[in-house]
Amino acid sequence: MTEFDGCTNGATNMYLPGCAYYVSPSEFSTKTSFLSQGSSCPVTFPYSSNLPHVQPVREMAFREYGWRRSKWQYRGSYPSYYPSEEVVARDFIQPSNRRSDVLFKADPLCAHHGTPSAASNLYSTVGRNGVLPQEFDQFYEASQPTSVPPEHVGSLDKTGSKTQEVPPKITHSPDKKMGAEGRADSPSGEVAADKSNSSATPQRSRKKRCPYTKYQIRELEREFFFNVYINKEKRLQLSRMLNLTDRQVKIWFQNRRMKEKKLNRDRLQYFTGNPLF
């Protein structure tokens, strides 16, 4: 137990790892505490403290770190709000001695953005449209359409009502491309009735076609082969024999002559090869 012989004369106030008992602080009276030394690097806090033992906050001198003075500028204890004039003076107005260093240090004087209160100070008044400031009223007035006099408004209303009163064009339901073949197969009386109905009431659907029977077509074609133009007596005879009206027989012969004329023109064009002939 010789390693503990040197520790037998101490008191029991401080514990040492090498001894089984405590040592009095009088043994270390010559050593100063490390807490009594002052701070070699004072730190600045942005808030004020009410504790009596804390020293008052003092400004910390930054040596142009990052060449951005506005970024590292000390503002002391931040108040709850800033007056707009003070903010503009501090953020936008740089000291005169800093102007010469702009070219060398590239200080972003113009690129620095102020606080919303500064912006509200510059554009504190709102223009006509309620959004942009008064400086933009000249553009707002230029973009507004010129007011129309009441006389022109009345004339415009009259012309608009006239255009609305114009009825749409009547579109005829019969197909224009229907050749003489369809005309020959349809009764002459009903064709005329369809034309009159379509001109009078274009909204109504076309009446269903009632074609001639094969017997009627055969007898009419036979008569047309011998006589292209039929007289009134023969027309009345055919109408009684085929159970048709005199008008139906007359219109059928008209359509058949148009069909024959078209067929002759097509034959001539086919053999001559001249489309203008």
UniProtKB/Swiss-Prot annotation:
Gene Ontology molecular functions: DNA-binding transcription factor activity, RNA polymerase II-specific; RNA polymerase II cis-regulatory region sequence-specific DNA binding
Localization per Swiss-Prot or TrEMBL: Nucleus
CDD domains the UniProt entry points to: homeodomain
SUPFAM superfamilies xref list: Homeodomain-like
Predominant location: nucleus
Presence of the UniProt keyword Transmembrane helix in the record: no
DNA-binding region listed in the record: 205-264
Biased composition (Basic and acidic residues): 172-184
Entry GO terms, CC: nucleoplasm
Residue stretches in coiled coil: none
Region (Disordered): 143-209
UniProt keyword list: Developmental protein, DNA-binding, Homeobox, Nucleus, Transcription, Transcription regulation
Family annotation (InterPro entries): DUF3528, HD, HD_metazoa, Homeobox_CS, Homeodomain-like_sf
Function: Sequence-specific transcription factor which is part of a developmental regulatory system that provides cells with specific positional identities on the anterior-posterior axis.
PANTHER family on file: HOMEOBOX PROTEIN HOX-A11-RELATED (PTHR46092), HOMEOBOX PROTEIN HOX-D11 (PTHR46092:SF2)
Similarity comment: Belongs to the Abd-B homeobox family.
Protein name: Homeobox protein Hox-D11
Lineage of source species: Eukaryota, Metazoa, Chordata, Craniata, Vertebrata
Name of the encoding gene: HOXD11
